[in-house]
Regions:
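Conserved redox-active cysteine motifs that mediate thiol-disulfide chemistry
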Residues: 1-11
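Short, conserved sequence motifs used for protein processing/export or organelle targeting and
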Residues: 10-11, 19-185
Length: 185
């Protein structure tokens, strides 16, 4: 339904090689949506889809990820994540995640960790999976994945207003599980 959302997918793909950037695609009104994440996202990223945010502090257009990330990446943080371990239990079909942080001095305030499990290469031919595409035919500008990602697929050179996920290599960075179903951690 979101014909401008290829801009978010391409922007996340462009950031993949950037150190210390973890991209998360939050979906809305499609089979990949997590209602608790989607419903609370406007707290940090106002303005609708596709929107972009960095560190729950900055928000803007996904095309500004690089600038937003650069303005935050060297900020002093109160702690660091030393380790993350994930364990899959095939019997229960659940993933358990544990982490260890290191505080860089005294910490006061309400600090929380939130874990988001993301998945790449999601495809389906079921209803709700094709990507609406307002960039079709190039009239709304160029919107193309980097050449080394998703085959450099271009949403602007196709004339398709609805693009099957398999055509562009599938959805990447998709939030699939949110710890405690709470964006606040």
């Amino acid at each position: 339904w979101c014909g401008w959302c290829p801009r978010g997918a391409v922007a996340l793909a462009e950031m993949e090689a950037t150190p210390n950037f973890i991209g998360i695609a939050v979906h809305n009104a499609d089979p990949m949506a997590i209602s608790s994440y989607d419903g609370s996202l406007g707290t940090y990223v106002p303005g609708g889809y596709p929107g972009g945010g960095v560190d729950r502090v900055l928000s803007g257009d996904p095309s500004d990820f690089s600038t937003m990330h650069a303005s935050r990446v060297n900020d002093v943080v109160p702690c660091g994540v030393n380790s993350i371990a994930a364990f899959y239990d095939g019997t229960t079909n659940k993933i358990s995640v544990s982490t260890e942080i290191e505080a860089f001095g005294e910490m006061s305030g309400d600090f929380r960790l939130s874990c988001v499990i993301v998945e790449d290469d999601l495809e389906s031919t079921s209803s709700g999976w094709p990507q609406a595409n307002y960039y079709a035919g190039g009239g709304s500008g160029t919107m193309t994945f980097p050449s080394n990602i998703n085959g450099g697929y271009s949403f602007s050179t196709t004339n398709a207003q609805s693009v099957p996920a398999a055509d562009f290599g599938g959805y990447d960075h998709v939030a699939r599980s949110l710890s405690s179903n709470d964006i606040l951690g």
